[in-house]
Amino acid sequence: MEAIAKHRFARISPQKARLVADQLRGKPVAQALEILNFSNKKAAELIKKVLESAIANAEHNEGADIDDLNVAKIFVDEGPTMKRIMPRAKGRADRILKRSSHITVVVADR
């Protein structure tokens, strides 16, 4: 039994979000939530919401017991990049890339 939750177009760089996601892969959901609660990264807050949604999906749609759930898969894919311009001296301009992510969490029983 698997339950999936996604957050698409999350306004965070995939590189930064993967730092948090890699810590959770394969862990029981209780331990994963504990890690996210004590992490002070922006990605932790976003991933925590997705994980809680996946847990709720498993409980509601599949009738799963929360104590038996593990983070089976968690991955962060790159979303679209917004291009912005930062004016610089002497008429120049630098490009700013505002990256976004697609966060996917799959929970399954052990």
Swiss-Prot record:
Gene3D superfamilies membership: Ribosomal protein L22/L17
Lyase keyword on record: no
Alphabetic keyword roster: Ribonucleoprotein, Ribosomal protein, RNA-binding, rRNA-binding
Biological processes per GO annotation: translation
InterPro entries registered for this protein in UniProt: Ribosomal_uL22, Ribosomal_uL22_bac/chlpt-type, Ribosomal_uL22_bac/org-type, Ribosomal_uL22_CS, Ribosomal_uL22_sf
Molecular-function GO term, any one: rRNA binding
Cellular component GO terms, alphabetical: cytosolic large ribosomal subunit
Domain of life: Bacteria
Any matching Pfam family: Ribosomal_L22
Functional note: This protein binds specifically to 23S rRNA; its binding is stimulated by other ribosomal proteins, e.g. L4, L17, and L20. It is important during the early stages of 50S assembly. It makes multiple contacts with different domains of the 23S rRNA in the assembled 50S subunit and ribosome. The globular domain of the protein is located near the polypeptide exit tunnel on the outside of the subunit, while an extended beta-hairpin is found that lines the wall of the exit tunnel in the center of the 70S ribosome.
Protein family (similarity comment): Belongs to the universal ribosomal protein uL22 family.
Subunit structure: Part of the 50S ribosomal subunit.
The name this protein goes by in its record: Large ribosomal subunit protein uL22
Provenance organism: Photobacterium profundum (strain SS9)
Gene name of this polypeptide: rplV
